[in-house]
């Protein structure tokens, strides 16, 4: 699952074995999870 940096807008892969979560490009700590591009269809009853 990919994340996106809120400062530089780069796609970031998270290494969960490393203790700190930061953008490797700019060092910013706020990352948002990218949403999937597919649309989920649910049938209404």
UniProtKB/Swiss-Prot annotation:
It catalyses: RNA(n) + a ribonucleoside 5'-triphosphate = RNA(n+1) + diphosphate. One of its GO terms (cellular component) is cytoplasm. The keyword Ribonucleoprotein does not apply. Its EC number is 2.7.7.6. It comes from the Archaea. It holds the Pfam family Zn_ribbon_RPAB4. It is found in: Cytoplasm. Its cofactor is Zn(2+). GO terms for biological process: DNA-templated transcription. It is an enzyme of class 2 (transferase). The keyword Transcription applies. Part of the RNA polymerase complex. This is DNA-directed RNA polymerase subunit Rpo12.
């Amino acid at each position: 699952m990919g994340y996106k940096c809120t400062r530089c807008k780069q796609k970031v892969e998270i290494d969960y074995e490393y203790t700190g979560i930061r953008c490797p490009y700019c060092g910013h700590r706020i990352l948002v999870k990218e949403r999937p591009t597919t649309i989920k269809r649910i049938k209404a009853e």
